[in-house]
Amino acid sequence: MPFMTERPLTPREFLDECIAFKRERLTGGRFLAALVQGNVTAAQLRLWAKDMYHFVQPGIPALTAWLAHAPTAVERESARLIARNLAGELGYLREPDHRDLYLKLLDEGFGISEAEAKEHLPLAGTIGATTALCAFCRSSFAEGLGAFGLALEMQVPGRPNGAAVLYEALRRLGLSESALEFYRIHVEAEEEHGENAERAVAPFIQTREQQALVRHAFRWTVIALAGMQQGFDAYLS
C-alpha cells in the first residue's frame, strides 16, 4: 500500500491494511521465542527485564501528552476512549498504576531495584522504539492514534495476546502471581485498549491526507517495535 492512496479508504479498509502490515512485520525474535520455550538463563531474563523498564516507564507520560492533543470541540468520543485507556494505565479503574506494577515485577520477580534498572543502558532497538512512540504521541492526536493506539495496542486477529504469552512463559519459569500482576492485568487491558483505539481512529482517517499521517506514524512505530523485539536477540549471545 502506498504512503498516500488514490482515494481515501473506508475506516474498515484502513484498519485491515494496518492489521496486515502489523501481522507481516511484528513477528518477534529469537530471544522472545526462547523465552516462551523456557530456554533463557536467569541472567538473560534480567537483562531483558531491565531493558523493558526503559520502554514501559516513558509510555504513560507519552500517553498523557497524546491525550492533551485531543480536539474535543467537534468530536469528543475519541478523546473519551483514549482517556479511559489512560485512566487504566494510571491505576484509576481497577488495578494500580501500571508503572508501579512493572517495578513490582522487577523487585519480586528478578530482585532488581528501580535504581539498578535506571543504571542499565538499553539496547539501540529499545531506545528507538521508545523514542518513536513518544515522539508521535507528542506530535499530534492523529499520529498518537497511529503509534500508540494502532501500532502498540491494536490486536492482530488470530494471533495470541502478547501479554498472555509472556505471562504464561514467566509463570512457567517460576515467577509468582504477585510479581506477574503487570502482565496478568494486561491480558484483559490490551484487548480493551486496542478496541478503544480502533473506535477512536475513525474520525481522523476521513481523507487521504489524514490517512497518510496516521499510516506514517503507524508504520514507523511498528518497524521500531520490530527492531526492539529483534534487538533482544543480542542477549542470547
Where do the model's predicted regions map?
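Non-heme di-metal
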Residues: P2-S237
